[in-house]
Amino acid sequence: MTDTEKSFKVVLLGEGCVGKTSIVFRYIDNIFNDKHLMTQHAGFFQKHINIGGKRICLTIWDTAGQERFHALGPIYYRGSQGALVVYDITDNDSFIKAKNWIKELKTMLGNDISLCIIGNKCDLEKTRVIPLADAEAYAKSVGAIHYSTSAKLNKGIEELFLDLTRRMILNSSGVVIHSNTNTTGQTTNRSERIPIVPDSDSGNKQPGCCSN
């Protein structure tokens, strides 16, 4: 990060196999791997963008979603300015678990964090089990914005991160970012993917395949 850049920490939460890492890969490097394995550790990615004439460095923390990693969550989202809580629109349990993540976030970080709830895998609309209206109503009830995305089809990803960044800028400085602000000229530096806290038990578990 340069002296003129503003840095924001964003934490990515949700159960395993909802497509969290696929969303980040699509945003950072515009790639999608339908053979992507379940994340077995936490790590972060960085992207540098220009938005509203401001230089922004986003540090996006991707966390493992398995139950045995849940207790580590507070370690990673402490100090975050933004949170993306992801669920799979074809998996009701993932939506229930997303609500648990949000309760925990609210308890620890209060209402100051910019919160987005993401219904991922919208390319599987025919098998949707979470009504969009229900998800949007829940998001509104907790002060969040709901987004529908598909990492596979690259749908809604760019808009999600740009809108989140605008909200974090607004929360941190009070500067109003108008909806007609030109944000299409964003630039990126080489992204960094640095795994941390490796899973010492990963060799004993057969990872699942998670994408979309």
Swiss-Prot record:
Q: Which SUPFAM superfamilies match?
A: P-loop containing nucleoside triphosphate hydrolases
Q: Where is the lipid attached (S-geranylgeranyl cysteine)?
A: C209, C210
Q: How does it sit in the membrane?
A: Lipid-anchor
Cellular compartment(s):
Cell membrane
- Keywords, alphabetical: Cell membrane, GTP-binding, Lipoprotein, Membrane, Nucleotide-binding, Phagocytosis, Prenylation, Protein transport, Transport
The record's GO CC annotations read: cytosol; early endosome; endomembrane system; lipid droplet; pathogen-containing vacuole; plasma membrane
Q: Which GO terms describe its biological process?
A: cell motility; cortical actin cytoskeleton organization; filopodium assembly; hypotonic response; intracellular protein transport; phagocytosis; positive regulation of phagocytosis; Rab protein signal transduction
Q: What induces the gene encoding this protein?
A: Activated by limf and repressed by ChLim.
Which InterPro entries does the record cross-reference, listed alphabetically? Answer: P-loop_NTPase, Rab21, Small_GTP-bd, Small_GTPase
Region Disordered: start and end of each range?
Answer: 181-212
Listed CDD domains: Rab21 (cd04123)
Q: Name one GO molecular function term.
A: GTPase activity
Q: Where is the composition biased (Polar residues)?
A: 201-212
Source organism superkingdom: Eukaryota
Q: Which family does it belong to?
A: Belongs to the small GTPase superfamily. Rab family.
Q: What does this protein do?
A: Involved in the regulation of phagocytosis.
Q: What is this protein called?
A: Ras-related protein Rab-21
Specify the species: Dictyostelium discoideum (Social amoeba)
